[in-house]
Amino acid sequence: MQTGFVRKYTVLLLLTVLGYLFEVCVMPYLKIFGVTPNLLYVVIGIVTVAYGKLRAFWVGLTYGLLMQIMIPSVTFLNLALYSLTTLFCSFAFADKPLKTLEYERVVNRQRKELPAWLRTVLCTMLNTLIYEIVQITYIYLGGSAVTAAHILRGIADVVFTGLLCLLLQYPIRIAILGRRRTRPVLRPAPVVFSKN
């Protein structure tokens, strides 16, 4: 029990640090049509579905602080964007706690959840979309004309970040949660009481 706990949080710490280092050092050289996918939101999307809302918020807050310190464009913009978009998107895409799932099962209010891989990609793309909308709004409020090139670059960033998430989520989820083991499913059988 304790080994799994330590392993899971060690992987979370390494994922957070390596995600930031790769975003700053490697991703600027991996431009696709002049657009760099946002690796930080890929990591945030994966952490949101694999670890839950609270840990995703802490990773988003950490990334926001680091980006605010390293790239101080607008006062507290990166800090607010990374932490708040992570928090709001995690409500829609994070796994529900077991208590909530059991409560919904008892009161017959079950809803079908999307698969984890799809929720991860959608969470990443929604985070990136909100980030790009805020950036384009900031360009507009700064007095610059927003052109179709700005909008196309924003859309390209959302798509490329979603594709990067699709590529990276499986190896990272295996590192976090381990390989999925198939277990035999027990079939329900009627209970028979004997008179003895």
Question: Each predicted region: which residue ranges?
Answer:
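Terminal, non-globular segments
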Residues: 1-196
